[in-house]
Amino acid sequence: MDEYHIPVLLDEILSFLVKEKNGIYIDTTFGGGGHSLSLLNKLSNKGRVIAFDKDIDSIKNNNILDARFNLIKTNYRFIKKKIKLFNLNKVSGILADLGISSHQINSPKRGFSIRYNSILDMRMDTYNKINAQHIINNYSYNELYNLLIRFGEVKNAKNISKLILKHRKKKYIKSTFDLIKILNFFYKKKNKFLSKIFQSLRIEVNDEINALKDLLKNSLSILKPGGRIAVISYHSIEDRIVKKFLKTGNFNGIIPYDEYGNNLSPLILLEPRIIFSSKEEKKENNRSRSAILRIAEKKI
């Protein structure tokens, strides 16, 4: 099977997420379609899957031909608006497999990987105007510093930001290898350091944190009582957001209580501990190694 099509934590998703075999489920990150296809196989003839993806490559590569399935090119932050196209207001379950797909990281022209010399792009939706090249060459010192701290928790963010500004005055920074060459003074563990830099840029390019918050808020709104939401994250920055929201229904992580001390959080965590992929899956699928799954159910 092509790595593009290997779904992460599939058994766990099917076990926890599918509560109603006649229900309507949303796959907010279609990717190669592995999760969507498996959900369809789990559901009855009356069940339905609606999938979203902002990457045109994912849309073009879809090979699921099933009357119970619909695929829409859009950012998952618009989930609430888009399901109205199908005259829907509530759904039985929602799946979000966050982060970058194997297809994107392994596509040399997309600029996501430190392995390939390509244009600094990093757009998941290639119709967007802003790419990583624009950010590197146009952001101010403060803007660069803040995104490195917020989205990568990068050490030496001050010096790195200053060095980027210094080099871009001399020459426009075009490619991934241009940037890596500039940064070679800073890293001891090359892959780990550069991955954090690239992660910071990718999150900024795709507005991933704000999109995630929109997704979570809208998911809570359209999830029917007793419906479930499953979120797979790949780094601590997005996982902290997911953890707080699924536990409390807000982003400050404070559980709301009424005057009698009753917990007013709209969701219940089905598994209080983080769900990780098995040792066997980690051997077969590299992407699953950093995967963190959290699942919650909307209170009835």
Curated annotation (Swiss-Prot):
It comes from the Bacteria. Keywords: Cytoplasm, Methyltransferase, rRNA processing, S-adenosyl-L-methionine, Transferase. Its main location: cytoplasm. It is found in: Cytoplasm. One of its GO terms (biological process) is rRNA base methylation. One of its GO terms (molecular function) is rRNA (cytosine-N4-)-methyltransferase activity. Its EC number is 2.1.1.199. S-adenosyl-L-methionine binds at G33, G34, H35, D53, F78, D97, Q104. It catalyses: cytidine(1402) in 16S rRNA + S-adenosyl-L-methionine = N(4)-methylcytidine(1402) in 16S rRNA + S-adenosyl-L-homocysteine + H(+). The keyword Cytoplasm applies. Pfam families: Methyltransf_5. Signal peptide: none annotated. GO terms for cellular component: cytoplasm. The keyword Repeat does not apply. InterPro entries: RsmH, SAM-dep_MeTrfase_MraW_recog, SAM-dependent_MTases_sf. Specifically methylates the N4 position of cytidine in position 1402 (C1402) of 16S rRNA. Belongs to the methyltransferase superfamily. RsmH family. This is Ribosomal RNA small subunit methyltransferase H. It comes from Karelsulcia muelleri (strain GWSS). The gene is rsmH.
